[in-house]
Amino acid sequence: MGDSSTDDTNYLMIKNILTLRYNPTKRSLIPKLSWRNFLEKNVSNPTHFIEESMRNTIIKKIGHQTKRISIALSGGIDSALTLAILRDTLTNVNIDAISIRFAGSIDEVDQAAIIAEKFEANHHVVHIENYLKELPKAISIIKLPFWDLHWYHVVKKAKSLSNFLISGDGGDELFGGYTFRYKKFLSLTNEDSTTLEKIKAYLQCHERDWVPDQEKIFSKKITFSWNKIYDFLKPNFDNPLPRLAQVFLADFNGKLLYNWLPLNSAFHRHFEVKPITPILSQELISYTSHLPYNLKYDGQSNIGKLLLRKILAKYLTRKLLATKKQGFSVNTINLWKSYGRELCNYYLSDGRILRQGWINEKWIKSRMSKLDNEPQIRYVNKFLGLLALEIWCRLYVTKEMKPTTLLV
């Protein structure tokens, strides 16, 4: 790379993204929250406050003169509620709902179609056969080595329909949507768990982001230490909050701030689409972070987003809502079998990330051969992350690849 300070910055970025799937050393677009932000406060009529706040954000950001607006519609609670309030607020606006259908993946597109019809929105389904095909173009926009870039396809489609794109971003982090994580974390820890034990338990709840032999991935130029990773997460768990609230804090200060927001914002700028996120307004962030925990998550039934569900019940019957959280997600095992394995073999067998001394060639060859026999999802995810790093390297370090290159 050349400059030593640039090298160090990039090495840190590489380690973080390949372990956490985000880089917490970057400056976030919205402020991090502290543990004090998650102290409970008594509230009255929270559903009314939340709904009116979302409605006011829509009016403020869009106005009554706008003729057409796009919405990302996964079929889940957050996007369905956002669509419901959008239609109830702007009764005459033309709404284009966008859903993504990935080949070989389970999705909520059929559910989304019913919800779109209910609120008189034109439903557009973007079919993605090869999820990795336009990876060089997407990486050239965000300038970071990420592979899971579904938002690229959403915004690209939105640009052809409207100058506005509204979404339900923030619902999981602010209203308790990661129920699978809460249940697992609480089962792995207790009130006497140390800070380090809770950090390790939290990482276990993100086990698809890293692999058991994580430290062996890196080569001589990049020194990996789990202790450095623990240090990033420590403020979220070294505080007097109850364990559940500590997870709320860690979730907000993690992928939301350092993955989804910066990446989505880069796509919005590139395609010149104005984003509207009614759930993620500063007003709602300040309000919802202090909500009593039992208004977010019911541990007995393992159900989250309790307040959003209550509001949405005014607009939709329960049977119209997806029972299992899905969102826009690709089946990585099927992606690996159809395109990922061949692309990783082609680009990583003589990878520039190996020549640069970043990634361990022996690890690549050993794990690749094992994946041929048994594609484990954690290692598939890791190889897709390494493929993204290889593309980033060829775009910005060796500069031998063009953004228009298609991975086929």
Q: Language-model segments: which ranges?
A:
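Short, hydrophobic/amphipathic alpha-helical patches that form generic packing surfaces
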Residues: 7-21, 250-262, 381-398
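N-terminal glutamine amidotransferase
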Residues: 1-41, 56-59, 151
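PAPS-dependent sulfotransferase catalytic core
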Residues: 318-376
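Conserved cytochrome P450 K-helix E-x-x-R motif and the immediately C-terminal K′/meander segment
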Residues: 261-263, 315-318
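ATP-dependent adenylate-handling active sites, centered on carboxylate activation for C-N bond formation
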Residues: 35-244, 266-315, 332-333, 382, ...
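Acidic, carboxylate-rich catalytic segments that either coordinate divalent cations
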Residues: 10, 354-408
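Active-site-adjacent bridging/hinge elements
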Residues: 126-134, 257-262, 283-285, 357-367
